[in-house]
Amino acid sequence: MMFNLKSRKNRRGFTLVELLVVVLILATLMAVALPLYLSSVADSSKKTCRANMQSIANAAQAWKVKNRAADFTTMTISALTPDLGAVPSCPDGGAYSIATTGSVNDESGASTAIPTGSLGISCNKAGHNGFIPGVMTK
């Protein structure tokens, strides 16, 4: 059986080497793009969590005015539902809590004391930290 060289030249398609080069290029792009994408997703979750804490802080201020309260000691998160509609949930599954004493960890992990008459809002999801309105601006 003889192979006809003329019929081989007329065939169309990709060689194995060409396909391997394409696969190698795609793998390289994925190796660069995937970590950047995952980092962006994690960063957006933290920013959403922070925005939720800001919404809770705004609702707490509204509660304080409506109830003519001197401070936040008698307030609970569930008391904020008239202003929030529903208590926001952390996009990564964490739960929010409000404290009027103690401290809250900021984005660097440093502990910041909650000033008298103020409140601190925390998310129990690791890496999401907390927020004190008027103290923590980032």
What are the residue ranges of the model-derived segments?
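N-terminal leader/signal peptides at the extreme start of proteins
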Residues: M1-F14
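Secretory/exported precursors with cleavable N-terminal leaders
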Residues: G13-F14, L19-V21
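Alpha-helical hydrophobic helix detector
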Residues: L20-L36
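Conserved catalytic core of two-component sensor histidine kinases
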Residues: V23, R50, A57
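Aliphatic-rich helix starts adjacent to a transmembrane/signal segment
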Residues: L36-M53
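Histidine-centered active-site/metal-ligand motif
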Residues: C49, A126-N129
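Extracellular/periplasmic head regions of type IV pilus-like filament subunits
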Residues: N58-Q61, V65-A126, T137-K138
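Pore domain of cation channels
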Residues: I132-M136
